[in-house]
């Protein structure tokens, strides 16, 4: 399935720096330091992108990361203020579980998951990170999970139901679990 290109110029994107890491290269004269960054951009209305930048100076690395993130935008299907369904995704040694939450719950997430889901505009979400909690891999696993998310309409079409039937069924299941 080919991903549609999203034009970042049509969106009001906010940048968030998730990680700034100083890395060194050992050369004959000593160590050469450079910086790598992970940047998340999003409009808070269902669009989010992640990017990595590397440069000799921090501002240049952040700028490169932001440019990469704008080239890597995806659309995330939202249901009210949460995601349409639970998803578990693995990236490298990191496994991320994202679950929809009731309105008012807030974003219950760690340092790598929170900036990605908040940039996408998700207000209510439960998450858990299993395995490696390396921030780069957590951000990439979260982004992968959001990119694999399917909309309520798509899920209903696959099951030969209307979105209203599917949502009613889901609500019944959630109320019986709460009781």
Curated annotation (Swiss-Prot):
This protein's name: Small ribosomal subunit protein uS5
Residue numbers spanned by region Disordered: 160-179
Span of domain S5 DRBM: 13-76
Domain notes: The N-terminal domain interacts with the head of the 30S subunit; the C-terminal domain interacts with the body and contacts protein S4. The interaction surface between S4 and S5 is involved in control of translational fidelity.
Gene expressing this chain: rpsE
Domain of life of the native organism: Bacteria
Primary role: With S4 and S12 plays an important role in translational accuracy. Located at the back of the 30S subunit body where it stabilizes the conformation of the head with respect to the body.
Keyword list, A-Z: Ribonucleoprotein, Ribosomal protein, RNA-binding, rRNA-binding
Subunit structure: Part of the 30S ribosomal subunit. Contacts proteins S4 and S8.
Molecular-function GO terms, alphabetical: rRNA binding; structural constituent of ribosome
Gene3D superfamilies: 3.30.160.20, 3.30.230.10
Family label: Belongs to the universal ribosomal protein uS5 family.
One Pfam family recorded for the sequence: Ribosomal_S5_C
InterPro entries assigned to the protein according to its UniProt record, in alphabetical order: Ribosomal_Su5_D2-typ_SF, Ribosomal_uS5, Ribosomal_uS5_bac-type, Ribosomal_uS5_C, Ribosomal_uS5_N, Ribosomal_uS5_N_CS, Ribsml_uS5_D2-typ_fold_subgr
Any Gene Ontology biological process: translation
GO CC field: small ribosomal subunit
């Amino acid at each position: 399935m080919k991903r549609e290109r999203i034009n970042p110029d049509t969106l009001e994107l906010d940048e968030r720096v998730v990680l700034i890491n100083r890395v060194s290269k050992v050369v004959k004269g000593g160590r050469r330091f450079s910086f790598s960054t992970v940047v998340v951009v999003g409009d808070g209305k269902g669009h989010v992108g992640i990017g990595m930048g590397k440069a000799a100076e921090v501002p240049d690395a952040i700028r490169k990361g932001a440019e990469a993130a704008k080239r890597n935008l995806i659309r995330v299907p939202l249901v009210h203020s949460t995601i349409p369904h639970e998803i578990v995704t693995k990236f490298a040694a990191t496994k991320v579980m994202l679950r929809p939450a009731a309105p008012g719950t807030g974003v219950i997430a760690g340092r790598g998951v929170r900036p990605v889901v908040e940039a996408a505009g998700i207000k209510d979400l439960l998450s858990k990170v299993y395995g490696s909690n390396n921030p780069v891999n957590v951000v990439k696993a979260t982004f992968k999970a959001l990119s694999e998310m399917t909309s309520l309409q798509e899920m209903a079409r696959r099951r030969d139901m209307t979105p209203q039937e599917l949502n009613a069924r889901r609500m019944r299941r959630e109320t019986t679990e709460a009781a």
